[in-house]
């Protein structure tokens, strides 16, 4: 079950960030990394986390990996960091990541938890990239910034706006 298309999880970044293939792929890969790493950490620490504080602990673990991703993106590409803006930080509260930590990683060994994160993260990344590519092609007539239809192309401006995510 694809987390975006079937479970409708993580819709905030899907609608807001997927206006270009580049932004969508970057956000998808960032989410994939955070999901795999947080699943691994939650699974490894599951026996030591008291039940009463497990959700807060999961959020702290997720926030740690989001901070790493945020700093890496900022160091590698300041333009990309500006384009993604606050949505990188919002990975912390993505219900997909917290849901997988609670439903799977907290009950399974590290290896399976990483595979679960990889599968769900790749599904999320694929969905985000697909929507981003379609929106960029229809809205700007380009793919990864490369013009596909020439200078005379009149794109559908709504497709590159956040509301355009509802049309794809």
Q: Could you describe each region identified by the protein language model?
A:
Residues 12-15, 31-32, 36, 63-70, ...:
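Hydrophobic core segments of alpha-helical transmembrane domains in multi-pass membrane transport
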Residues 22-34, 57, 81-92:
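Structural signature of hydrophobic alpha-helical transmembrane segments
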Residues 13-25:
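Short, hydrophobic transmembrane alpha-helix segments
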Residues 49-62, 83-89, 113-116:
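Cytoplasmic-side transmembrane-helix entry/capping segments in multi-pass membrane proteins
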Residues 113-168:
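C-terminal transmembrane helix-loop-helix hairpin of multi-pass membrane proteins
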Residues 68-83:
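Transmembrane alpha-helix boundary signature
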Residues 38-51, 98-108:
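C-terminal ends of transmembrane helices
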Residues 28, 40-48, 52, 79, ...:
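Membrane-spanning helices that line or support transport/gating and their immediate boundary helices
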